[in-house]
Amino acid sequence: PELRIAFEDHIRTVAGHYRGRVYAWDVVNEAVDDSVAGLRSTVFSRGLGPDYVAEAFRLARKADPEAELVYNDYGGEGLNRKSNDVYTLVKDLKQRGLVDGVGLQMHISASSFPAVADIQANIQRLADLGLQVNISEMDVRIKDVAGDAATKLARQRQVYRDVVAACVAVPRCESV
C-alpha cells in the first residue's frame, strides 16, 4: 500500500503542479527488459504488478489531460526483440488511449549499429500506431571504429546523418 500511495501521489503532484504548462511528459522510462521478454524487474513491477505502466499513464492523463504522454526506452533502435517488446507495450497503451508518443534513446556504436532501413522501419511502425516518435537521446560511440581521429569522426557524422534521415523520412518522427 505504501508504494502504491507514493506512486500515485508522485504522479498526481508533479503532473498536477505543472498542469497545462508542460508540453509532454516522459511518463514511464525504460520499463522493457533487455534480456528477456516483458518488463524489467523493478520496485514498481514487483510491488505494483505488470499493469503499473498503464496505471502511470492513466494517472498522468488525469492530472494533465492536455499534455502529450510519452513512453521512453533504449536498445530498440532497429528491429529486434526489445523493439518488438516496446512496440507491443505502446500498441497496448495506444489502444487504451493512454499514450501519445514514444521516445527512442539511441546509445549506439558507429562500428555496429542497426541497419538504417531497420531504424526507419521501426520508427514507421510506431508512427503507424498513431504515435509521435522522438529520438529522445542520441550518442554515437567511436572508440571501436578503426582508423585515425578524422576517420572516426567521419563515421560518427555519417551515423548521425543516417539516423536523422531515417527520422525525417517518417512524418510522425518529430525530433532528434
Locate each region found by the language model.
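Substrate-binding cleft of secreted/luminal carbohydrate-active enzymes
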Residues: 156-176
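Active-site cleft segment of glycoside hydrolase catalytic domains centered on the general acid/base Glu
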Residues: 2-67, 71-88, 97, 112-121, ...
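Short, conserved, surface-exposed binding loops centered on an aromatic residue
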Residues: 95-97, 123-128
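Active-site clefts of carbohydrate-active enzymes
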Residues: 68-78, 104-110, 126-159
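Structural preference for beta-strand elements that scaffold enzyme active sites
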Residues: 22-26, 66-70, 99-103, 130-135, ...
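A generic local structural motif
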Residues: 88-91, 121, 162-165
